[in-house]
Amino acid sequence: SHAAISAEISGTTYTNEQIAETMRETWKECHYLLDPHGACGFRALKEGLKPGETGVFLETAHPAKFLETVEGIIGETVEIPAKLKAFMQGEKQSLSMTKEFADFKNYLLSL
């Protein structure tokens, strides 16, 4: 139920300035490069931990996905791994699809 899920999951929002601050501080203090979305997760984790607790957050993208933004925030050039660079230079492959689940399901079943 919605109530059961809401009891287990919390959410928060951050301003662009707070996100940038988290990225800068983490890079400066830990030499770990966050992407903007990861910075939100990391900051929420840090703010939500109780004394003595340890937590885990997950990054879903390499900071190079947001290259100009990340470089502007940390004031340094981000080195892109060779495999990622090759992938980013490849041809985009996508399929136009409606938002209807039935269309998605039919596509998957047609494979």
Show which residues each predicted segment covers.
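PLP-dependent amino-acid enzyme catalytic core
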Residues: 1-111
